[in-house]
Amino acid sequence: MNQQERNICYNCFKEKPEGGGPCPCCGFDLEENAAKYPAALRAGTVLKGRYVIGRVLGQGGFGITYLAWEQSLEAKVAVKEYMPGEMAVRIGGLEVQPRSAARREDFAYGKERLQEEARILAKFMGQPNIAGVTDYFDENGTSYFVMDYVEGISFKTYIANAGGKVSTEEALNVMIPVLRALTAVHGEGLIHRDVTPDNIYITKDGNVKLLDFGSARYSLGDKSKSLDVILKVGYAPKEQYIRRGRQGPYTDVYSCAA
């Protein structure tokens, strides 16, 4: 289902005049966003009869994250789609399929990992420093999960805006909430594996959120992929550089210190 015929902006979701060009309210340019992410769902696509897909927030090796509009609550949310570009292709603008029969097993394995991550993250709805999962479902041959949409800036941007460094007090004000979030996550047996400044967000009201859990859960491990596709140089401990390195909560602690 698609709502492209409606004249709305797929960033601020406000009505806009007919015709192309950037939104007069927020300046968002849909054509530019679509050209940047050709493998993404078309803006205006409706998932599960309730989530109107908007602009692409980001794309990684294993999936695409969209801004979306939840129609019943009339609120912005973030929707993650399992779309591993190296092993999958989109058919007819919607359906996601493995590129070949040889990739079918790997595709299914990664899809299961996404579903597992969503189920675990759904347990953290009451944790103030984690963007909780509110829904997950299968559609278009792949899997999706819906998260709180966090408006703010990344800690990476915050540091850059501060001239490349922050005070000890500022660093502690950010990292202590991150450690609280990791304590809850580790208690459920999940390891983040990608604690970096660009995955830590400071919201408009000053709250701190740790995002993008389970990057390594998307890794296909012994099946075909090595962990180097998800580690970030300068933040990853040595066990993440080893194909079968033993990882645990200490992996995240190292990244926090780095």
Where are the predicted features?
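AlphaC helix of the eukaryotic protein kinase fold
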Residues: 91-124
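Activation-segment/catalytic-loop signature of the eukaryotic protein kinase fold
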Residues: 136
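Conserved short submotifs of the Hanks-type protein kinase catalytic core
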Residues: 140-154
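AlphaC helix of the protein kinase catalytic domain
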Residues: 155-166
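Activation segment signature within eukaryotic-like protein kinase domains
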Residues: 174-175
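Protein kinase catalytic-loop region centered on the HRD/HxD motif
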Residues: 179-190
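Conserved activation segment of eukaryotic-like protein kinases, specifically the C-terminal portion
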Residues: 226-239
